[in-house]
Every structure is written in structure tokens, then in C-alpha cells.
């Protein structure tokens, strides 16, 4: 495994452990998502707002070769703290290819200095696939067994595993989260907005998962748009274009309560500002929205 890369804002590491997600700049692997901003600009703007830590972004955002990615990160004085991988976990026939996919991404993440792999269980080989019906007991057994295998993969690469309950995935609502917690020992990624969209209470999830939370996605949503997405009357991708994600503190997710609950549970790992957005043109400037979220969040984390 490659060396850990330690750089970035001393304030971010020592005080509030806050990273920024490239998703805040509209970065997405979906080809029809919207205008894409290159990594150089994202990294430089992250540093400009005082945050020297990011998450890895989707495939292709950073160079596939770890030495090239590390060179870019060093040049911009940024560290990567976590990265996400989407995998099909409930099909026994997909076990080999999916584990190989996860292992390859884990190797790359460790080589560029990340410490956490965020795993989302997708229904199909697409991060934005529509969610099918509930899993059968046999599919749940396959999923939980494979989660255990992914834990071993992460341990081999000295990474923490954080399974993310995510709207549109095979693990999203309260019943599925409880089944994950009871049926495995895996860590959890708490994504406030995705929990709200799926109809879960993030504070209740913090209390249920307390010592299992390994990573946190901070975000806020328009409650009416979130309800329409949950009910199926509005597509998730279209909802983002209509303003589903709002600057933190301006939506209905009650982020301050969630952070208070995390603090009460002695959570001490990384937070990531993860506000998905879609940019129509190169003239769009997401930095203003990011700064508004930071103005609200930073005092809560200090």
C-alpha cells in the first residue's frame, strides 16, 4: 500500500475535521448531470474557503493513477479523507466482480491517503438507479455476508468501512438500517439529507447506531421537495435541479440537532459537507452556496 499523504489545513484536521465533497461543485459521474468543474478548480476553491480536506469524488475526478492523484493533491495542499464506492451486494452471482471492484477502489483510496471507504448498496450497476422492491430474506443474507467481506477488504488496506443508508439504494429507511445494524458489525455513514428523504429521523439513527458511525455527510433539504421525492412524484435528479439541497441551516433537516446528538455520542471522525447540485453552465458559481453552509456549520463544530 502507498504511503499516507498528510497535508491540508491544520485547522480542518485539529479542530473540526470538516471536509468538502466535490458534489458541492456539481461533480457527478452521471454523463447527463450538468456542467462539470475540473479537479484543479475544485481543489483550489476548497483551499480558498479554508478547508484543506476533501472526499475523493466519483471515478475520473482525480487521476486513476495514485501517484498522479497524490501529485495533484500535494500541489494544491489538499488531503483526501474518504471516498465512496457503489456496489451490488444482494446478488450472490455478483460477489466476485463486486468484491474485486471494491478492493481496487480501496487500494487506490489508501494509496492517496484516505482513511474511510463509504459504501452504498445499489440495486444495479449505476449510482442513480431507481430502487426496486424490498429485498428477500435470501438477498439480505447475501448483502450482509458481503458487507462482512468488505470489512475484511477495508481492514487489509487499513481503511474504516462506513455503509451509507442512501435514498434509492437497497439500504435507506429505518427498517433496513436496523437490519444492517443487527445483522453486521459494519460502521455507518450518516447522511442527514438521504435519511430525511427516505423518511428516517437522523437523530434516532445517531442514537441507534451511536458507536458505529464512522463518517457523516452534512447537508440540508427543502422539506416539501424531499417529501415529493419520497412519495415518488418527483425524480431525485430533477429534484436537485429544483433546489432539493439548500444551504445548511436554511432547510428542514434540523442539522444542529443532529450535530448535538453526534457530540453527545462522542463522535470524533470526519464530517463532510455533501450538498449535491447540478450546474447548468460554466457561469454557475457554487462557491457562494458552499460558503453559506460553512458559515452555519463551522460554529457548530468548533
Where are these regions (language model features)?
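Structural preference for beta-strand elements that scaffold enzyme active sites
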Residues: 17-19, 53-55, 77-84, 115-118, ...
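Acidic-and-aromatic substrate-binding clefts and catalytic sites of carbohydrate-active enzymes
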Residues: 35, 53-68, 88-99, 167-172, ...
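Acidic (Asp/Glu)-rich catalytic clusters
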Residues: 9-15, 43-48, 62-82, 100-114, ...
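Conserved, mostly hydrophobic/aromatic
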Residues: 20, 46, 54, 73, ...
Amino acid at each position: 500500500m502507498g504511503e499516507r499523504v498528510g497535508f491540508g489545513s491544520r485547522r480542518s484536521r485539529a479542530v473540526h475535521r470538516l471536509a468538502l465533497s466535490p458534489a458541492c461543485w456539481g461533480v457527478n459521474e452521471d454523463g447527463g448531470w450538468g456542467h462539470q468543474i475540473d479537479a484543479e478548480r475544485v481543489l483550489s476553491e476548497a483551499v480558498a474557503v479554508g478547508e484543506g480536506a476533501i472526499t475523493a469524488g466519483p471515478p475520473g475526478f482525480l487521476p486513476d493513477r495514485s501517484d498522479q492523484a497524490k501529485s495533484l493533491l500535494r500541489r494544491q495542499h489538499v488531503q483526501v479523507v474518504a471516498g465512496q464506492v457503489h456496489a451490488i451486494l444482494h446478488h450472490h452471482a455478483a460477489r466476485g466482480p463486486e468484491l474485486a471492484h471494491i478492493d481496487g477502489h480501496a487500494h487506490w483510496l489508501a494509496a492517496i491517503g484516505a482513511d474511510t471507504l463509504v459504501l452504498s448498496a445499489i440495486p444495479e450497476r449505476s449510482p442513480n438507479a431507481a430502487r426496486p422492491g424490498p429485498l428477500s430474506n435470501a438477498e439480505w443474507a447475501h448483502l450482509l455476508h458481503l458487507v462482512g467481506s468488505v470489512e475484511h477488504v477495508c481492514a487489509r488496506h487499513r481503511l474504516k468501512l462506513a455503509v451509507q443508508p442512501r435514498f434509492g439504494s437497497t439500504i435507506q429507511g429505518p427498517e433496513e438500517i436496523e437490519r444492517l445494524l443487527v445483522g453486521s458489525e459494519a460502521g455507518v455513514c450518516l447522511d442527514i439529507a438521504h435519511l430525511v428523504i427516505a423518511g428516517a429521523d437522523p437523530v434516532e439513527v445517531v442514537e441507534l447506531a451511536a458507536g458505529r458511525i464512522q463518517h457523516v455527510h452534512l447537508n440540508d433539504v427543502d422539506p416539501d421537495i424531499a417529501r415529493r421525492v419520497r412519495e415518488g412524484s418527483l425524480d431525485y435528479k430533477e429534484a436537485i435541479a429544483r433546489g432539493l439541497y439548500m444551504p445548511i441551516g436554511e432547510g428542514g433537516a434540523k442539522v444542529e440537532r443532529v450535530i448535538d446528538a453526534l457530540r453527545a455520542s462522542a463522535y470524533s471522525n470526519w464530517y463532510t459537507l455533501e450538498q449535491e447540485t447540478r450546474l447548468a453552465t460554466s457561469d454557475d458559481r457554487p462557491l457562494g452556496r458552499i460558503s453559506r453552509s460553512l458559515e452555519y456549520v463551522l460554529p457548530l463544530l468548533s
